[in-house]
């Protein structure tokens, strides 16, 4: 019943994330259950909803639509997680604060959402060198039991996801659409098992892809990650926006440092100059020592086991990558 009630809120025109958070805050402050507020509609007014919105919310048609969607989630083993629950990713909640999504939908191993993780962002039309570097970075992380987080798009994202899975690691697919339309892509279908992945979406389950949502989900990728690796970024678009948001939210941003950046990576120098940490290499292998240092710093604060870097030794200042 509770899931259908939450979906009823999400489906109502005029109710967005901010209004849902106000309702949740009201329930906590007044010690009400969600069912209580649906049984006593005047409580919605006390929670700050307008009368016309309340009428839409409580319509029979919307109630039936929400119940049908809840049933479909159950049939597909999809979890609805609110920010009030312990299963909600705590790092996301801490990183984004009041801007974290009030509701997530997840399918797969949801414990990965609260695991040490590094996010990836990069071009859909990445260079072969960029793809290779992303795969090598993900391999090192997987070998050190660090979850790889990315946006499940072609190019950089898929290279990072696939490499993590190929190297017996785990990955989080952060969707720019609802979780119901999502499918397992051919490139990774033979690598998937019940424990090594989770799909997660902040959008209504039947939402189709759009560019605005692709930008919006950047916050979830960043919020789930203790550090971000920017592989290749042009001077506009989703990767550029993700890099800017990482810097703005204080998420450590690591940037592949190319000796002669091409168009696919023309904004990489900008991010290094703006506070990103350069990732260089030795014998073509990315040196992730500072990434592991960030993870270990967070592990010590959380009293968890630190990771031991498998990156090349011999200092952080290595050689820039050639495209």
Spans of model-derived segments:
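Short, positively charged patches
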Residues: 1-132, 139, 321
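Glycine-biased, small-residue-rich flexible motifs in mid-sequence functional cores and linkers
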Residues: 2-3, 83-323
């Amino acid at each position: 019943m509770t899931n259908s009630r939450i979906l009823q809120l999400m489906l109502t025109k005029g109710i967005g994330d901010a209004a849902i958070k106000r309702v949740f805050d009201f329930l906590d402050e007044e010690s009400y259950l969600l069912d209580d507020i649906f049984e006593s509609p005047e409580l919605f007014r006390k929670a700050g909803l307008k009368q016309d919105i309340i009428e839409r919310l409580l319509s029979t048609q919307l109630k039936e639509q929400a119940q049908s969607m809840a049933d479909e989630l159950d049939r597909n083993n999809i979890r609805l997680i609110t920010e009030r629950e312990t299963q909600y990713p705590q790092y996301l909640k801490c990183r984004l604060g009041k801007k974290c999504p009030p509701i997530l939908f997840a399918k797969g191993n949801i414990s990965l959402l609260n695991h040490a993780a590094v996010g990836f962002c990069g071009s859909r039309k990445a260079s072969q060198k960029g793809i290779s570097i992303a795969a090598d970075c993900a391999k090192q992380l997987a070998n050190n039991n660090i979850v790889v987080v990315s946006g499940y798009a072609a190019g950089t994202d898929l290279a990072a996801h696939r490499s993590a899975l190929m190297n017996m690691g785990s990955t989080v697919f952060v969707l720019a659409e609802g979780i119901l339309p999502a499918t397992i892509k051919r490139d990774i279908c033979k690598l998937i098992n019940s424990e090594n992945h989770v799909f997660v979406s902040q959008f209504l389950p039947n939402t189709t892809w759009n560019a605005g949502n692709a930008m919006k989900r950047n916050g979830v990728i960043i919020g789930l990650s203790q550090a971000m690796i920017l592989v290749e970024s042009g001077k506009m678009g989703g990767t550029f926006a993700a890099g800017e948001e990482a810097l703005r939210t204080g998420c450590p941003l690591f940037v592949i440092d190319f000796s002669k950046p091409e168009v696919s990576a023309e904004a990489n120098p900008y991010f290094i100059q703006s506070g990103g940490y350069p990732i260089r290499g030795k014998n073509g292998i990315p040196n992730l020592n500072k990434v592991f240092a960030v993870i270990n710093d967070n592990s010590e604060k959380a009293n968890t086991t630190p990771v031991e870097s498998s990156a090349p030794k011999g200092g952080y200042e290595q050689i820039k990558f050639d495209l």
